[in-house]
Each structure stands twice: as C-alpha cells, then as structure tokens.
UniProtKB/Swiss-Prot annotation:
Signal peptide: none annotated. It catalyses: phosphate(out) + ATP + H2O = ADP + 2 phosphate(in) + H(+). This is Phosphate import ATP-binding protein PstB 1. SUPFAM superfamilies: P-loop containing nucleoside triphosphate hydrolases. One of its GO terms (molecular function) is ATP binding. InterPro entries: AAA+_ATPase, ABC_transporter-like_ATP-bd, ABC_transporter-like_CS, P-loop_NTPase, PstB-like. Part of the ABC transporter complex PstSACB involved in phosphate import. Responsible for energy coupling to the transport system. Residues 20-260 form the ABC transporter domain. Keywords: ATP-binding, Cell membrane, Membrane, Nucleotide-binding, Phosphate transport, Translocase, Transport. Belongs to the ABC transporter superfamily. Phosphate importer (TC 3.A.1.7) family.
C-alpha cells in the first residue's frame, strides 16, 4: 500500500500565477486521527481546480482548512500561503481571511431572511449602511451568480421560497458580495437536480474570469466539464495534480487511473 501512496505528479506554477498555496499541510482530529498528510499544492489564478477522491480521502478536510474552517475541530499543521502571508499562523484574523477566501457548502444554506437581506447581511455587519451602495452590490452579486433575472422582482421575498438550485446560486451571490478573491466549494451541486446543476456549472465557468475557485466533487463528469486542474486524493494523501485533461486522459499513476476508470472508490 505504501507504494501506491507515492505521489505520481504534482503540478507547479510560476510564483506570479499562484493565488493560494499550501506547504506540508496536515490535519489531525482529536490530536491523534490524521486525515491529511503533508499536502503541498498551488492554485493558479482565475482557474477552477477540482479535488477528487473517494469518501474519506481528505479532500473536504483539505478544502475547509484553506480558510481556517477546521480551527475548532482539528489541529492543522503546515503552511497556507496567501498574498505573501502564511495564513495558518495563530495571529491571523480568520474573519478577515474569510472575506478574501469565501466558502459555499454542500447543501444550500440561505438565511431565513429575504433574498436582499441574505446578500447585505454581512455587509451591514461590517458597517455598510448606504442604501444605494447596498442595492448596487445586491444587483452585481446576483448578476454574477446568474440569478438576477430570476429574482429581481421579488428581492423582499423569503430566500427559503427559492428552489434548491436558486438557493445555491444565492449562497454564491452572498459569498461574492464581500468581494473575495478565492471561492471554495464543497460539493456545491450534490443536492441539486441535473437542470440546476447545469445552471450552477455555467455560473462557475463565468465566474472564472474574476475568481480563483477550488471545488470538491464526487462527480467525475462535472470535474472534467468545468475544471482546469484536478487533484486526486487517496487516504489523506495528494497522489496526483495536473491539468484536468491530463488527469482524465493520461494519468501518471496507476491508482489515479483506477479511480478515474471506476475500479475503486
């Protein structure tokens, strides 16, 4: 098994092209159960990177560590580099960090408020009160999430009345409202029907020109359709990281090939 866990290939980029990177990132739960081992990855600006692997492979643990979502439940060792700072240091303000590195979760989680209030809630909490400015951000965020045309006449209606797919795009709009540079997505389409999934994928592809995105997915077809790069995780290790085209058509490692072909996982 140790032979299988050797890395096959880990792609790197020119320093100026990197939006976010990790160095020897490891995660332990309860101080003794290690779920991630020495993960070192670079994420290229304005691309979508898919994290794939079987359940329990460490991909979601890795993703949630990137903006310190695991702080209260796990010990995270190693480095996370963003704008020249190791943001895994204890002196980092994690709330400010999460404005720059946003998160969209597996299931839509709109606030039990109006569509408008879902977008402006965090902005108001951070001192923005000008109605004209807030209205502008609401429209821009909903347009970016490809939701504006569907909800522009019912912004004061409950967000809970939206369909599942609309709710997930609202959650993306809510994350975009605070102007992040990076968007983390943990299986964002897993609870959606095929039509809603297609709309969500189109939205993510449009956002790529402005944001860097890292997405966990169990859907191999989805990874191949919308991602530029793919990282394959297995038993807490990053086994292979390359362009999505290479991962799916010419994987370097046998274990990667087996997973892509559905031989395990």
């Amino acid at each position: 098994m140790m032979q299988e866990l050797k890395q096959s290939y880990i792609k790197t980029f020119d320093k100026d092209d990197v939006a976010l990177s990790t160095n020897d990132l490891s995660v332990l739960y309860g101080g003794k159960v290690q779920k991630l081992f020495d993960a070192s990855l670079q994420f290229k600006k304005n691309t979508i990177t898919a994290l794939i692997g079987a359940s329990g492979s460490g991909k979601s643990t890795f993703l949630r560590s990137l903006n310190r979502m695991n702080d209260k439940v796990a010990t995270v060792n190693g480095e996370i580099w963003f704008h020249g700072l190791d943001v895994n240091k204890p002196n980092i303000n994690v709330y400010e960090l999460r404005k720059s590195i946003g998160m969209v979760f597996q299931r839509p989680n709109p606030f039990p408020k109006s569509i408008r209030e879902n977008i402006v809630y965090a902005l108001k909490a951070n001192g923005k009160t000008d109605k004209q400015e807030l209205d502008k951000i609401v429209e821009e965020s909903l347009r970016a999430a490809a939701l504006w045309d569907e909800v522009k006449d019912k912004l004061d209606k409950s967000a809970l009345a939206l369909s599942g797919g609309q709710q997930q795009r609202l959650c993306i709009a809510r994350a975009l409202a605070v102007q992040p540079q990076i968007l983390l997505l943990d299986e964002p389409a897993s609870a959606l029907d095929p039509v809603s999934t297609s709309k969500l994928e189109d939205t993510l592809k449009q956002l790529r020109s402005k944001y860097t995105m890292v997405m966990v997915t169990h859907n191999m077809q989805q990874a191949s359709r919308i991602s530029d790069y793919t990282a394959f995780f297995h038993l807490g290790h990053v086994i292979e990281y390359n362009s999505t085209a290479e991962i799916f058509t010419n994987p370097k490692g046998k274990i990667t090939e087996d997973y892509i072909q559905g031989s395990f996982g």
